[in-house]
Amino acid sequence: MSLGRRRFLAAGLGMTPLAALLSACGSRGDWPEGMQEIKWDRDTCVRCTMAISDRRFAGEMRGGPKNTVFKFDDVGCAVLWVRDKLKDFPWMADPETRFWVADLRSRGGEVKWLDARRAQYLTKTSPMGYNFGAVALPEPGTMDFAEMRAHVLAKGK
């Protein structure tokens, strides 16, 4: 083997860790199976068009024959979107439709995602003023999805 070829092979082997590191930079992170990545501060809420910035209140719905995705900055926007658009997207009422909300207690860049219909909700100031944040388990002052939904629908907007 010539000296030039050895250098070429050695350089290629030396670049392998760098290539692995760079490929990790484009990874999807800890998104649940089937959830489309939310691009923070760039993606907008399908209902109010506000940028999705506060990770503690974000949500996403995915389903239907085309696996359509809707992203939300506030669970209240999601509730009202379903009310307003159910005729256009009847699959949103299907229990098979996936619906995620961020855990209110998520910190930093790490977001824990919850099934919106199984989560519990605390009263907490939220981006659009519907004032509910999701937590995983019942605790004093929480309500289930149906009760939170009723409050949002009563408030309207």
Located regions from the model:
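Mature extracytoplasmic domains of secretory-pathway proteins
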Residues: V69-W113
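N-terminal secretory signal peptides
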Residues: G29-D88
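C-terminal motif of bacterial Sec signal peptides marking the signal peptidase cleavage site
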Residues: S23-A24
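Alpha-helix boundary/capping residues
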Residues: M15, D84-K85, K155
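Beta-strand-rich cores of mature extracytoplasmic or soluble domains
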Residues: T97-K157
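N-terminal secretory signal peptides and thylakoid transit peptides that target proteins
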Residues: M1-T16
